[in-house]
């Protein structure tokens, strides 16, 4: 049966190719031409049969009672000859040169003359090219040409990145109906409804005179019951534009009653207010006004999670519910990498052990990736100018800092500091660290970067601590750690820098210290239950967690060897002690660990 299908498909492809080549030859040789399309000062010889087969518009025209002379020469008004030429060639060859400069014109013309094959190719192209800079224009095009597939794709793209896109100038130029099509969407990726309200009011103020009259209609798409009541009183009720609009004031009164627990009776004739949404508490027939909608947006399912990134996958762990979620596959992420999460909740992975066997001059590479939270994919960024390992990572104002480490080629200790600017998309060097160091740790807090411990050129552990101010561009010494160490865990927890475990001059350590940023003093904390190196510390939602690392474990041969452990511990602040949570979480093997906020709505439970 399969062989028969394969034969049938082979014959179909052969016949299609033969037919396409034959049609192309007939056009080029101008054989059997029976009509001409005229656009501007250009004429395009064609075949009625081909045009009719590819377009309902032309089929109806050529089958109509129009006199024969008009069918032979068809004048097309307001048509760009160059665009028409591309479309005609596609009909005969199934090949078209689409680019950002011509796709919208080709799309519009194929829509006008009902040529679905060209139309579909344009839609697919535009869907693949969606970006923050063009998504609103593509949304507008999809709505204008009545193409639901394109409009929905663009709207979902905007919804996923609403916080970013609502700040764009294009957003301020949306028509009322275009704005409504965006903000009425359940899948809007906002953690707070306040973001939607502020975006709408900024849109209104961009053209206050004309848009204030549309406010009532747009108002219906904002889900005020999802706001904090205090915010509603301070920012919505007191807004000058809202106070001066009698129609909106009526709705404000209803909302005030709703916050007090008194909802109006659902009405079968109540308008949806452009939202197309039904209140979750009532049936399909009994509707509340759109501005009383209390269905959470998709972005409101965000939760604080521990992200474990290794060379197989990025898995999010919820310590409160003891659940794991697949965030992204990570086969391109090297082992022994470092990772960081920025203040804007952007996850980056830097470095790791990767050997490019095809590159004879520089076989060792330090790659750089960013996690796209929307597509759950890793985006490649410019790699480090020179490969290094055992470095520290910091972040200030969305810029990533790679501090010191070891050169992968020469194994020399480094004091250089690299800075990645995401706007310029390039690396540059900033002020060197005062000493060459590797195996240290770096943490960022309140616009400053802290570099702690590590090993110096003489392979001895240091207890020195430095602070870097990116605005001043200088490093300064802070109070040294009590115990010199390298390969330890670090986290900012309740306003203090906490470090745990690591390697000291005497071997593995279980000691824990905390640095008070206000007093510039170190204090001893409760020891970790086991001596470990490379332990990960994560402060999440007010709790401190310790994950994995390497410990000296006795083997069957009775010898002790460094062995990776993949357990999770929690520090109980009130009792000042460590409590075991999980004996093993396999996703922690070879993983870097981060505290991040992820949307459970987009994750798959493992």
UniProtKB/Swiss-Prot annotation:
Transmembrane segments: none
Reported modifications of this chain: Ubiquitinated by E3 ubiquitin ligase complex formed by CUL3 and RBX1 and probably targeted for proteasome-independent degradation. Quinone-induced oxidative stress increases its ubiquitination.
Domain BACK, first and last residues per copy: 135-237
GO BP annotation list: myofibril assembly; proteasome-mediated ubiquitin-dependent protein catabolic process; protein ubiquitination; pseudopodium assembly; regulation of myoblast differentiation; regulation of myoblast proliferation; regulation of skeletal muscle cell differentiation; skeletal muscle cell differentiation
Intervals holding Kelch repeats: 346-398, 399-447, 448-495, 497-542, 544-599
Entries under Pfam families matching the protein: BACK, BTB, Kelch_KLHDC2_KLHL20_DRC7
UniProt cross-references to InterPro entries, sorted A to Z: BACK (IPR011705), BTB-kelch_protein (IPR017096), BTB/POZ_dom (IPR000210), Kelch-typ_b-propeller (IPR015915), Kelch_1 (IPR006652), KLHL41_KL41B_BTB_POZ_dom (IPR030571), SKP1/BTB/POZ_sf (IPR011333)
GO molecular function per UniProt: ubiquitin-like ligase-substrate adaptor activity
Modified residues (Phosphoserine): 3
Cell compartments where the protein resides: Cytoplasm; Cytoplasm, Cytoskeleton; Cell projection, Pseudopodium; Cell projection, Ruffle
Source domain of life: Eukaryota
Tissue expression notes: Primarily expressed in skeletal muscle. Also found in heart and lung.
Chain ranges of the BTB domain: 33-100
Keywords: Cell projection, Cytoplasm, Cytoskeleton, Endoplasmic reticulum, Kelch repeat, Membrane, Phosphoprotein, Repeat, Sarcoplasmic reticulum, Ubl conjugation
GO cellular component: Cul3-RING ubiquitin ligase complex; cytoplasm; cytoskeleton; endoplasmic reticulum membrane; M band; pseudopodium; ruffle; sarcoplasmic reticulum membrane
Subunit-structure text: Interacts with NRAP. Part of a complex that contains CUL3, RBX1 and KLHL41. Interacts with LASP1.
Reported function: Involved in skeletal muscle development and differentiation. Regulates proliferation and differentiation of myoblasts and plays a role in myofibril assembly by promoting lateral fusion of adjacent thin fibrils into mature, wide myofibrils. Required for pseudopod elongation in transformed cells.
Name used for this protein in its record: Kelch-like protein 41
């Amino acid at each position: 049966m399969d062989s028969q299908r394969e034969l049938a498909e082979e014959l179909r492809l052969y016949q299609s190719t033969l037919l396409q080549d034959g049609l192309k030859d007939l056009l080029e040789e101008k054989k059997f031409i029976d009509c001409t399309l005229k656009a501007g000062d250009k004429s395009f010889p064609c075949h009625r049969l081909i045009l009719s087969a590819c377009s309902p518009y032309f089929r109806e025209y050529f089958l109509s009672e129009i006199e024969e002379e008009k069918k032979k020469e068809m004048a097309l008004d307001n048509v760009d000859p160059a665009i028409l030429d591309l479309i005609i060639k596609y009909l005969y060859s199934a090949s078209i040169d689409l680019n950002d400069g011509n796709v919208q014109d080709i799309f519009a013309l194929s829509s006008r003359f009902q040529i679905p094959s060209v139309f579909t190719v344009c839609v697919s192209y535009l869907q693949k090219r969606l970006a923050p800079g063009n998504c609103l224009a593509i949304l507008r095009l999809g709505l204008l040409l009545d193409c639901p597939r394109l409009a929905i794709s663009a709207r979902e793209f905007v919804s996923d990145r609403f916080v970013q896109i609502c700040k764009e100038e294009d957003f301020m130029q949306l028509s009322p109906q275009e704005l409504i099509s965006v903000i009425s969407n359940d899948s809007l990726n906002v953690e707070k409804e306040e973001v939607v309200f502020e975006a709408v009011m900024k849109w209104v103020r961009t053209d206050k005179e004309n848009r204030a009259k549309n406010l009532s209609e747009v108002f219906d798409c904002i889900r005020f019951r999802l706001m904090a009541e205090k915010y509603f009183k301070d920012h919505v009720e007191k807004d000058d534009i809202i106070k001066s609009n009698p129609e909106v004031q009526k709705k404000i009164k209803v909302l005030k009653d709703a916050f007090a627990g008194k909802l109006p009776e659902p009405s079968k004739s109540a308008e949806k207010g452009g939202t197309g949404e039904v209140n979750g508490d009532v049936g399909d027939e009994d509707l509340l006004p759109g501005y009383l909608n209390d269905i959470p947006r998709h972005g409101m399912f965000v939760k604080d999670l521990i992200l474990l990134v290794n060379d197989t996958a990025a898995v999010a762990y919820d310590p409160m519910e003891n659940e794991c979620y697949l965030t992204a596959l990570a086969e391109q992420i090297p082992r022994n990498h470092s990772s960081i999460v920025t203040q804007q909740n952007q996850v980056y992975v830097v470095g790791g052990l990767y050997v490019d066997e095809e590159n004879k001059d520089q076989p060792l590479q330090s790659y750089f990736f960013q996690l796209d939270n929307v597509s759950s994919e890793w985006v490649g960024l410019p790699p480090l100018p020179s490969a290094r390992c055992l470095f520290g990572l910091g972040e200030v104002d969305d810029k990533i800092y790679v501090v010191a480490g070891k050169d992968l080629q020469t194994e020399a200790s480094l004091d250089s500091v690299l800075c990645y600017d995401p706007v310029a998309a390039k690396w540059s060097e900033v002020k060197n660290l005062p000493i060459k160091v590797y195996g240290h740790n770096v943490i960022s807090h309140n616009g400053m970067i802290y570099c702690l411990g590590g090993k110096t050129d003489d392979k001895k552990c240091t207890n020195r601590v430095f602070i870097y101010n990116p605005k001043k561009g200088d490093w300064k010494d802070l109070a040294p750690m009590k115990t010199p160490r390298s390969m330890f865990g670090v986290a900012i927890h309740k306003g203090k820098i906490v470090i745990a475990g690591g390697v000291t001059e005497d071997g593995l350590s279980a000691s824990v210290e905390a640095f008070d940023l206000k007093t510039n003093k170190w204090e001893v904390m409760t020891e970790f239950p086991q001596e470990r190196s490379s332990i990960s510390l994560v402060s999440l939602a007010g709790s401190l967690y310790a994950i994995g690392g390497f410990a000296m474990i006795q083997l069957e041969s009775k010898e002790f060897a460094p062995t990776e452990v993949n357990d999770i511990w929690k520090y109980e602040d009130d009792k000042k002690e460590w409590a075991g949570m999980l004996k093993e979480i396999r996703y922690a093997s070879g993983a870097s660990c981060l505290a991040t906020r992820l949307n459970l709505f987009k994750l798959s439970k493992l």
